[in-house]
């Protein structure tokens, strides 16, 4: 039965001493045992010799990462967030504005600067007839699975602040990231993997802040050609095997029983221990998840032998294994100049892999339960950037931006909202960043105003009580 919103429900999302029964500073300081070997048997659910249930990260786990049913009907169970860092130009990607061409090089009414129409053409694609830019030919093939939001806007068009806002829902420092909130609310389906994994990006985008540290994103620095031990540093313990580590766990369990009554909570130490525990658990599964050489050649070809191709293939493998939230960073969208060459380069890097991800998830029956989100921190101006570049570009614009979503319960083959005739600002059915965040949480089964965490005497929320669900994009 889906739990109602009650104090008990919220308390069950907060780790208790029973969940984190592992504070033993003296033991850690005096023992020579490696940290990676000291994962709590109680959290792993392991017997001394290990069990099939433990090895598969079964759903009968307890503790802060145990899976929890959302309080409301959910469309999506997992999220893949493709973050286009730098601020993609909406008019050069997903928001056609033919009126701009009539004013090329002229001053636009009500705007300061010379009009800069997109050099790229749009054409209707799919059964839905949504207009898609020529720089996204592969995504045009799957447009009937996608919802394009053309009326998104943000508060401050400065990179650091806007990136923080998109990823944490706050203009202030520090606040928990989107992935941390999601895993805090839902737990994760695989206890042998982190619930929140990032492939690139800044630490601030994956921070847990005042949430318990177990909800922080685990970053993986991946690059094509990397070996597994380079992708996942220190994933294995070179000094001992898993069997011996399990025996050590049994020994640690006995120490836990002896010292449980003396337990004193130490948040910083608990966070470090939880990280070491996860490192042990990942030995059994993470190496497999990140090894894309195990994929058929046909599948690797579908995604492409590129950085983004490999990262999105890994994202699918992670979601397939029960990881709740995966963020893939894709930088380079800060096009103050050279739009003519920069946009095709950037779009080309993500077009094929993102289309492959949609097709692959659909073929596996995972698209309906996996929400894919693409977008950056703001949009760009529709006038030329005054930076003196011979090849024109665009400046930052927080009043107009674009994002698309696919799978996870969104309506396919649709657009929502619109900018004005030139694309300078969101005008019709405006969607603020808080609205986008509220909609994401709704698709996952949460009322964004009721998913709270109490800290320093007040209840905090991802949206800080702002925002409205965009119901028209939900199927």
What is each residue range found by the language model?
Residues 1-475:
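Ligand-binding pockets and gating/stacking loops
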């Amino acid at each position: 039965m889906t739990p109602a919103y009650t104090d008990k429900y919220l308390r069950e999302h907060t780790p208790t001493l029973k969940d984190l029964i592992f504070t033993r500073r003296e033991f850690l300081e005096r023992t020579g045992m490696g940290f990676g070997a000291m994962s709590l048997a109680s959290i792993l659910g392991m017997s001394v010799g290990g069990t099939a249930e433990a090895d598969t990260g079964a759903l009968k786990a307890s503790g802060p990462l145990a899976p929890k049913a959302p309080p409301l009907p959910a469309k999506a169970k997992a999220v893949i967030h493709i973050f286009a860092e730098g601020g993609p130009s909406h008019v050069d990607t997903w928001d056609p504005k033919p009126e701009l061409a009539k004013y090329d090089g002229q001053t636009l009414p009500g705007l300061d600067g010379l009009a800069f129409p997109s050099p790229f053409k749009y054409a209707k694609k799919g059964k839905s007839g949504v207009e898609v830019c020529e720089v996204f030919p592969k995504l045009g093939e799957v447009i009937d699975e996608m919802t394009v939001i053309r009326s998104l806007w943000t508060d401050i068009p400065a990179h650091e602040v806007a990136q923080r806002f998109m990823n944490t829902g706050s203009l202030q420092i520090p606040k928990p990231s989107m992935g941390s909130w999601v895993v805090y609310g839902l737990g994760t389906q695989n206890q042998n993997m982190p619930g929140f994994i990032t492939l690139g990006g800044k630490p601030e985008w994956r921070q847990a802040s005042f949430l318990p540290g177990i909800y922080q994103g685990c970053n993986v620095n991946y690059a094509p050609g990397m070996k597994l031990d380079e992708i996942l540093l220190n994933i294995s313990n070179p000094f001992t095997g898993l069997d011996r580590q399990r025996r050590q766990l049994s020994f640690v369990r006995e120490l836990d029983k002896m010292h449980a009554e003396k337990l004193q909570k130490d948040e910083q130490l608990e966070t470090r221990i939880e990280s070491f525990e996860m490192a042990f658990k990942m030995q059994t599964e993470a190496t497999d998840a990140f090894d894309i050489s195990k994929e058929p050649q046909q599948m690797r070809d579908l995604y492409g032998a590129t950085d983004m191709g490999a990262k999105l293939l890994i994202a699918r493998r992670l979601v397939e294994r029960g990881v709740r939230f995966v963020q893939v960073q894709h930088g380079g969208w800060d096009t103050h100049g050279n739009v003519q060459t920069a946009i095709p380069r950037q779009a080309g890097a993500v077009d094929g892999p993102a289309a492959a991800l949609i097709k692959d998830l659909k073929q596996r029956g995972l698209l309906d339960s996996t929400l894919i989100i693409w977008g950056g921190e703001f949009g760009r101006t529709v006038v030329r950037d005054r930076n003196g570049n011979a090849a024109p570009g665009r400046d930052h614009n927080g009043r107009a931006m674009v994002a698309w979503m696919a799978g996870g319960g969104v309506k396919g083959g649709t657009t929502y909202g619109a900018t004005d005739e030139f694309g300078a600002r969101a005008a019709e059915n405006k969607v603020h960043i808080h609205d986008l965040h509220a909609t994401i949480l709704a698709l996952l089964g949460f009322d964004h105003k009721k998913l709270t965490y109490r800290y320093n005497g007040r209840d905090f929320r991802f949206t800080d009580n702002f925002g409205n669900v965009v119901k028209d994009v939900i199927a």
